[in-house]
Amino acid sequence: MSRLAKRHPDLLSCNFNQDYSCIAVGHKKGYTILNCDPFGKVHSNNDQGATGIVEMLFCTSLVALVGAAENQPSNSPRKLQIVNTKRQSTICELIFPTSVLAVKMNRKRLIVVLENEIYIYDISTMKLLHTIETGPNPNAVCALSSSSERSYLAYPSPVPSASSTPLSSSAIPAPPPAPTTGDVLLFDTISLTALNVIQAHKTPIAALALNSTGTMLATASDKGTVVRVFSVPDAKKLWQFRRGSSSARIFSINFNLMSTLLAVSSDTSTIHIYRLASSRKGGKDADDASTEEARSPTPSETPLASSPPLAGGKLDSHSAASSLRRRSYHLGKSFVGGVGGYLPKSVSEMWEPQRDFAFIKLRGNHGRTVVAMSATVPQVMVISSEGLFQAYNIDLENGGECSLMKEFALLGSEDFGNGSNGI
């Protein structure tokens, strides 16, 4: 998540770029771009004004900015600016009907997330291609693959209960329901089609992450005790990991660039790193593994290939997901009815989700955190709402507790002086 708790008096937001080589920081006077290794400032602008969202496009000079000043039209949270930091110029400005909650980019698409809508733009022309009506998503939970070829978008699917029936054509359409289920809708931003609805959890989705190649999706619910990894786009469950037995608020999930490790941070003092390459895969066994939130083994991973084409450049997530849910529900119900009576309740406990491979113990009151893994050295990087960047060494052979190697402040007194260096 890019928006962090405001524990540092000047920090408004902080996030890694797509390959975890840089950090984008928004603060009360503007924004700063930092290099991770070696750590250091690359660019700063202290004349921008309060900046709530800063999103980079890899290590290029293209940066998306969203203001954080409700009473200043030039720095409104409804205003998105695309700027070139090297030329110190504004490429375009867009105004939205409500506050922009998140911005995601890859080399083909720019995604703008509002509470009830997602806008998809062609990043080369900034032409609006598509609008998705999502229903309430106040935490802007979504993920965009950094891959240009598999430019998939994942977000919570506002799906009604499986037993609900569609409205008749004469009925007054109801607003999209809140995402009270743990379903995730997978959308192809290149073909502009819905691909799949994944029944990931039983409670609402709290965090999502797609790997760099767009082939895996990691999910966590608002209960925060289990993390699942699915293949994309066919939605086969690959792994299931136990974060802990008590509930926790998940702050961030990130794959490493090789998709062999998965890091998860939460409101607890422990950051978990899971190994993907050697863990026992989920498949059939892990479907019932979680005592927290396992779902019935319905064939929920049915592609939306048979769905009608989208009309008017707009996707109603409610309708698309409802169609899929009705098909999968009836088939799944008959399957469960046939075999459910033969399975003892304790069977679900036989397939305990995998525990972490390595972990980090954070010191003191760390606030909100974002975790990522370096692509160049065996290190786990953590940025926090305290305004700190920390790098921990990880033993890739044996795992265990990671050791703190270096720590830097994201903001210093020089951030509120003059001077700016382009990327």
UniProtKB/Swiss-Prot annotation:
Query: Origin, by domain of life?
Result: Eukaryota
Q: Where in the cell is it found?
A: Preautophagosomal structure membrane; Vacuole membrane; Endosome membrane
The entry's cellular-component GO terms read: endosome membrane; phagophore assembly site membrane; vacuolar membrane
Question: Positions of the region Disordered?
Answer: 281-317
Report the Gene3D superfamilies cross-referenced here.
Answer: YVTN repeat-like/Quinoprotein amine dehydrogenase
The leader peptide range reads none
Q: Where is this motif: L/FRRG motif?
A: 241-245
Membrane topology reported for the UniProt record: Peripheral membrane protein
Return the Basic and acidic residues bias intervals: 282-295
- Keywords, comma-separated and alphabetical: Autophagy, Endosome, Membrane, Protein transport, Repeat, Transport, Vacuole, WD repeat
For this chain, the family text in UniProt reads: Belongs to the WD repeat PROPPIN family.
Role description? The PI(3,5)P2 regulatory complex regulates both the synthesis and turnover of phosphatidylinositol 3,5-bisphosphate (PtdIns(3,5)P2). Necessary for proper vacuole morphology. Plays an important role in osmotically-induced vacuole fragmentation. Required for cytoplasm to vacuole transport (Cvt) vesicle formation, pexophagy and starvation-induced autophagy. Involved in correct ATG9 trafficking to the pre-autophagosomal structure. Might also be involved in premeiotic DNA replication.
Description of how the protein assembles with itself and partners: Component of the PI(3,5)P2 regulatory complex.
Its UniProt domain note says: The N-terminus might form a beta-propeller domain involved in specific binding to phosphatidylinositol 3,5-bisphosphate (PIP2), leading to the association of the protein to the membrane.
What's the name of the protein? Autophagy-related protein 18
